[in-house]
Regions:
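Polytopic endomembrane small-metabolite transporters, centered on the Drug/Metabolite Transporter
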Residues: 1-329
Length: 329
């Protein structure tokens, strides 16, 4: 019986016949629940033996656990609990003495929720390289704010790199043979939230809050907000009908996703604090290149020459941006 259910799961994932809907959020956009498009397929274990899909993507796109308030709430809950435990054990240092500074950071926490929510909805419909191309265009908001609002001097090379990122993100939907309006809409919302988050972080003058302090506040706020939104969004009771609710693969993937997300956050925070901004930008760029390069081994992606050209242009634009950050030009 277990083998028949497992085989059925793989067949549905391969053929794109989703059992549930792709990350619904009627509370945010008034979007009706409908079947997710057969955007992506996961390779079978026979083709890539021993290489499982990333845990979060497996939960969202294969098992089709399409309840983002619950899934993102779970991830932030795990991250918050592990960060709190690390703090109490003395492994990390967190200082939350000033209530005024905590309150002043809450707008960024709202944007953080928007980033993870919109990002998860977009990633359930768009291939990872496409999503990263749109994500990179958030730098346009940051650079535009510096140049036109703060009147900072911006080098021609940096302007050129930002224009590359913008051109790639704008042209990509026009070249995409599997254009998904909902996926790109959520990617756009994610882009705006990331850009505004960076601008807020640049304007905000912290007195004592470190990156880990800020992340701790983000975790706590996200858990409270997402838990409160789970009932109005309809996710709380709808998840009870999830067909794989009691499957060990679902439980283990959720646990692995929460753990990996926390350790990635912790490593990123330590890397950011121990390197220069240019070095951190270079490592971040390398991580994106590796992620985009490995994603075809997990997800089938239909791309033509124009689509690949947009991805390359975005990569060139970010490489130039890293160069300007390292050289200070």
């Amino acid at each position: 019986m277990g083998r028949e259910v497992s085989a059925g799961t793989q067949q549905e994932a391969k053929e794109g016949r989703c059992l549930l809907l792709a990350l619904p959020c009627p509370a945010l956009l008034g979007e009706s629940r409908g079947p997710a498009p057969p955007r992506r397929e996961y390779p079978t274990s026979e083709k890539f033996p021993g290489i499982p899909p990333p845990p979060s993507e497996y939960v969202l796109s294969v098992l089709q656990f399409t309840y983002p308030t619950l899934f993102q709430g779970w991830q932030t809950l795990v991250g918050g609990l592990l960060l709190h435990l690390s703090w109490k054990l003395g492994w990390v240092e967190i200082n939350l003495c000033s209530r005024s500074e905590i309150l002043s950071w809450l707008p960024a926490s709202v944007l953080f929720v928007g980033i993870i929510y919109a990002g998860s909805r977009s990633l359930s419909r768009l291939p990872i390289p496409v999503f990263l191309t749109v994500h990179n265009a958030a730098e346009v908001i940051t650079c535009g704010f510096q140049k036109f609002v703060q009147k900072e001097q911006t080098s021609h090379l940096k302007v050129c790199s930002v224009l590359f990122l913008l051109a790639a993100a704008v042209c990509l939907p026009l070249c995409d043979t599997q254009f998904d309006p909902s996926g790109y809409l959520w990617a756009l919302i994610h882009l705006v939230c990331v850009g505004v988050y960076k601008v807020f972080h640049k304007l905000w003058k912290p007195g004592s809050l470190s990156d880990l302090d800020q992340q701790y506040i983000n975790y706590v706020f996200s858990v409270v907000l997402l838990a409160s939104a789970s009932h109005p969004a309809g996710d709380l009771f709808s998840a009870l009908d999830f067909p794989f609710l009691y499957f060990y693969r679902f439980h283990s993937s959720c646990c692995a996703s929460g753990l990996l997300g926390f350790f990635l956050m912790l490593h990123t925070a330590k890397l950011k604090s121990s390197t220069t901004s240019g070095q951190y930008a270079a490592w971040s760029f390398l991580a994106k290149v590796i992620t985009a390069s490995l994603s075809p081994f997990f997800f089938a992606m239909t791309a033509n020459v124009l689509t690949i050209s947009c991805l390359v242009i975005s990569g060139v634009g970010e490489a130039l941006l890293v160069y300007t950050e390292r050289t200070g030009t």
